[in-house]
Amino acid sequence: PLGVEEILVTARKRSESIQDVPVAVTALSVEQVERGNIQRVQDLEKLAPNVEMYDMAFGGGGMSASIRGLSFDDLEKTFEPTVGTVIDGVFAASNSGTDLDLFDLESVEILRGPQGTLFGRNTIGGVISINRTKPTREFGVKFKTDLEEDNTSDVKLIFNAPIGDNGGLKVSLRRLQSDNFAFNVTRNEREKMRDLTAASIVY
């Protein structure tokens, strides 16, 4: 018989069916993120309604998110953003460092509207909740390489291993490089448009 796949979300900090949650939430799976060519948090606006995200002009790996028109475009640590970012259950207190790379992703949930009851005062616009994969407690390697124009190379590696009877270790690495159209005559080479190295260890 035909059936409808149940979508589980953790918008209220517990696993529930998306049909039972009284919150406007967009839940994205790994497959949806990959099909949408979502590379980092900022790209999620392609798949979620009433959401805009853009780079912070003053760096810091920051991103300004706007949900239903509510946003805060600053990295100042003494001011809280109007849209909160939660990474693996940990709340990011400012916009700095929130434009994460999403190559090691388990799920994404975008909650629209005030979420202060569960997430605190600086979530009047909503919350972007990002969950990365956890150790599988089994030996395994996932490796992927993409080569594109402009000398773009994107190498991704995830390694899992068991530790003892109940523990696990996960190591994830990514190396992304891409040339710019600008040529540096002093160094006789093209400037790098993107040059990213990311690593994480979870146990």
Question: Each predicted region: which residue ranges?
Answer:
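Intrinsic disorder/low-complexity segments
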Residues: 1-2, 199
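Acidic, small-polar-rich N-terminal luminal/periplasmic segments of exported/outer-membrane proteins
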Residues: 2-138
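Outer-membrane beta-barrel translocator/receptor signature
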Residues: 82, 94, 103-112, 117-199
